[in-house]
């Protein structure tokens, strides 16, 4: 009996091999990809989605950006119901569009409209990478072109925020045509004295970077934004040279004269207001030359 007491094996509770799932609901917390700090999403949104620890600029949804810049209640959206079709009958394209509409609560990769920024009337276009990675298809090109034409009609500045992976491959050459179409609209607008302000956000690449994104009278960018046409690996294999670590970043482009300024998101509204102040002149729409 005494022998059994001392030789009896201890029993241990078994631990499940599966990872214990977090009880924190999805969306409550956000992890910064740069410094790895975990923060409340609500606090991050209040800080314009700029990391409170390292200053990393997280992706900002288009409607949040519009609300952060324009005067309250001043925004009127254009072409909200315009949606893409499948002109080339590309397999699975319609299903992907429907999935993105459901997930992003957007109809397309750009929102356009008019409003006032600290009292200045403007036409604005804001791209959103949550929808098809902000890719430019026929509808994106059409909405941006119509917005430019509206700014031309109203004699007000045109402000665009870009965030895109480039042309939308599912629409083939129809997508590539939007590069020429939007650029031509900007040329007409500029020739008549219209003010164009472009703000490139992460990422601005492909056909978007090679067309309307780079055609502003002022070309600004947010810190750390990836900006370029072809991918880093493609360029490296073509030139057969090691590229700088900061290649295709906003800071690299600024250093080489391709940007006018890299602007922290917290300073963006004040900077845009200053630009409008300068071009406004003595009152009215002083930015319109003709």
Curated annotation (Swiss-Prot):
One of its GO terms (biological process) is malonyl-CoA biosynthetic process. It comes from Geobacillus sp. (strain WCH70). The lineage of its organism: Bacteria, Bacillati, Bacillota, Bacilli, Bacillales. InterPro entries: AcCoA_carboxyl_beta (IPR034733), Acetyl_CoA_COase_Trfase_b_su (IPR000438), ClpP/crotonase-like_dom_sf (IPR029045), COA_CT_N (IPR011762), Znf-ACC (IPR041010). This is Acetyl-coenzyme A carboxylase carboxyl transferase subunit beta. One of its GO terms (cellular component) is acetyl-CoA carboxylase complex. Keywords: ATP-binding, Cytoplasm, Fatty acid biosynthesis, Fatty acid metabolism, Lipid biosynthesis, Lipid metabolism, Metal-binding, Nucleotide-binding, Transferase, Zinc, Zinc-finger. Its EC number is 2.1.3.15. GO terms for molecular function: acetyl-CoA carboxylase activity; ATP binding; carboxyl- or carbamoyltransferase activity; zinc ion binding. Gene3D superfamilies: 2-enoyl-CoA Hydratase, Chain A, domain 1 (3.90.226.10). Zn(2+) binds at residues 32, 35, 51, 54. PROSITE patterns: COA_CT_NTER. A zinc finger (C4-type) spans 32-54. Pathway: Lipid metabolism; malonyl-CoA biosynthesis; malonyl-CoA from acetyl-CoA: step 1/1. It is found in: Cytoplasm. The keyword Metal-binding applies. Component of the acetyl coenzyme A carboxylase (ACC) complex. Biotin carboxylase (BC) catalyzes the carboxylation of biotin on its carrier protein (BCCP) and then the CO(2) group is transferred by the transcarboxylase to acetyl-CoA to form malonyl-CoA. Acetyl-CoA carboxylase is a heterohexamer composed of biotin carboxyl carrier protein (AccB), biotin carboxylase (AccC) and two subunits each of ACCase subunit alpha (AccA) and ACCase subunit beta (AccD). Its main location: cytoplasm. Pfam families: Carboxyl_trans, Zn_ribbon_ACC. Belongs to the AccD/PCCB family.
């Amino acid at each position: 009996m005494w022998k059994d007491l001392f030789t009896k094996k201890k029993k241990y509770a078994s631990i499940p091999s599966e990872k214990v799932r977090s009880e924190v609901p999805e969306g409550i917390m956000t992890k910064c990809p740069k410094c790895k700090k975990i923060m409340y999403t609500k606090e991050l949104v209040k800080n314009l989605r700029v990391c409170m620890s390292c200053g990393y600029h997280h992706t900002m949804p288009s409607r949040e950006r519009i609300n952060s810049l324009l005067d309250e209640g001043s925004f009127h959206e254009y072409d909200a119901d315009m949606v893409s079709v499948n002109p080339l009958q590309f397999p699975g394209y319609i299903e992907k569009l429907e999935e993105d509409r459901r997930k992003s609560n957007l109809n397309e990769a750009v929102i356009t409209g008019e409003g006032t920024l600290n009292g200045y009337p403007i036409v604005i276009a804001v791209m959103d990478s949550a929808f098809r990675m902000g890719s430019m298809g026929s509808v994106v090109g059409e909405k941006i072109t119509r917005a430019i034409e509206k700014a031309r009609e109203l004699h007000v500045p045109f402000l665009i925020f870009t965030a895109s992976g480039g042309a939308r491959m599912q629409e083939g050459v129809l997508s590539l045509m939007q590069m020429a179409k939007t650029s031509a609209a900007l040329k007409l607008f500029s020739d008549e004295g219209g003010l164009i302000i472009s703000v490139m956000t992460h990422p601005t690449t492909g056909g978007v970077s090679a067309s309307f994104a780079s055609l502003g009278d002022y070309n600004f960018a947010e810190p750390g934004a990836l900006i370029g046409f072809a991918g880093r690996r493609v360029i490296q294999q073509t030139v057969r040279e090691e590229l700088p670590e900061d290649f295709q970043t906003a800071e690299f482009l600024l250093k080489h004269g391709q940007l006018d300024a890299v602007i922290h998101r917290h300073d963006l509204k004040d900077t845009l207001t200053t630009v409008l102040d300068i071009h406004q002149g003595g009152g009215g729409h002083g930015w319109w030359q003709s």
